[in-house]
Amino acid sequence: MNPNQKIITIGSISLGLVVFNVLLHVVSIIVTVLVLGKGGNNGICNETVVREYNETVRIEKVTQWHNTNVVEYVPYWNGGTYMNNTEAICDAKGFAPFSKDNGIRIGSRGHIFVIREPFVSCSPIECRTFFLTQGSLLNDKHSNGTVKDRSPFRTLMSVEVGQSPNVYQARFEAVAWSATACHDGKKWMTVGVTGPDSKAVAVIHYGGVPTDVVNSWAGDILRTQESSCTCIQGDCYWVMTDGPANRQAQYRIYKANQGRIIGQTDISFNGGHIEECSCYPNDGKVECVCRDGWTGTNRPVLVISPDLSYRVGYLCAGIPSDTPRGEDTQFTGSCTSPMGNQGYGVKGFGFRQGTDVWMGRTISRTSRSGFEILRIKNGWTQTSKEQIRKQVVVDNLNWSGYSGSFTLPVELSGKDCLVPCFWVEMIRGKPEEKTIWTSSSSIVMCGVDYEVADWSWHDGAILPFDIDKM
């Protein structure tokens, strides 16, 4: 075969392959059109099929694109029933770890929000960690000066419990430098306080939509719980403070249904001080253990009935649970009056167990370090000093901070009582450490039928970060 014949032969074969390839593409297009046409989708290539199962578990969302199926499982609650929450609190012999977010450790290299005041609240299908961001990330220049409590950049956001407060999974809830949140069985309600100190406003969101507001009535830093509010049979309750942090202030209980205020009452508490209440449902009422920033090292106790009548006093136990505080041996306790003459304080909690009380406190008497929870026999009703159990959660070599309460609803736990749970904030950075920022992580514990060994589930981040060395 001479050279010209070789060229002609190669050219013919190449042309044949090109024609064959074109025919294959034409056939592929025809088959695709015919197949999609028979599907009855009027020529639309993309469609989303949502199948709702009556299991109140999830929605199965199937996105179909040509011959590719993507299945995404979306948490779902039928939204048709309010949680009861009138059950009694379960009796707890100890507290087991529920979650730990390790946010600051991860934040040395991850995209983690600078936060304070984390807290946990639960719906019938999940628990979420809420937190107040500073509108900045760890190890970033905007984290400078975040020791400040109130700024226009602070927002309430949330993640599923156990997740770090990261930018990829966090959900926006409200603009806020003080907040509370709870679920009534149908939707989440959040209360976010923001604005200037003298004219702050609390915006109530229900199902993610603003539904009502509370304006500052005393003109002195309107603020709320920094922990879960409480919903009973569809109505949700929370406590607000307006006035000085170190002398007599004004206190109110609010009641809302579907995010709209349906009742409020002023709390008469002359000589006493209430703020940052940690509340939970118990036997059809709301029980709160609060912070006295004025004089008491014992904690105020507030019990709220559905008709907004209330009883207010102090935790009777003859052992103090606020910080700073004096020696246990020098404290006598009182059910009605502040004791100890130590101001400032820190947010804390307690759980009634019949006439006993579980109460959390820092291990240090003078600083926010270490954390333990004590069960005091008859401590809810008497000035008893009898400790019948003690459990260490953070050792005294490590920083702690705020702490607060919440419960697992029976829909979530499967029990016939409300499981008592608490969280402990572990503050890092300023003012105790040489950084430009202040942030925190948290450990969450829930009540169990067994005693649990002491251990230290501390924050564990190695400081300073790179940004602190610049």
Swiss-Prot record:
Region (Involved in apical transport and lipid raft association): 11-32
InterPro entries for this protein: Glyco_hydro_34, Sialidase_sf
Key words of the record: Calcium, Disulfide bond, Glycoprotein, Glycosidase, Host cell membrane, Host membrane, Hydrolase, Membrane, Metal-binding, Signal-anchor, Transmembrane, Transmembrane helix, Virion
Active site: 149, 402
Gene3D superfamilies noted in UniProt: 2.120.10.10
Organism: Influenza A virus (strain A/Duck/Ukraine/1/1963 H3N8)
Enzyme class: hydrolase
Cofactor(s) required for function per UniProt: Ca(2+)
Lineage: Viruses, Riboviria, Orthornavirae, Negarnaviricota, Polyploviricotina
Lineage: superkingdom: Viruses
Protein name: Neuraminidase
Subunit structure as annotated in this protein's UniProt entry: Homotetramer.
One record GO biological process: viral budding from plasma membrane
Membrane topology summary: Single-pass type II membrane protein
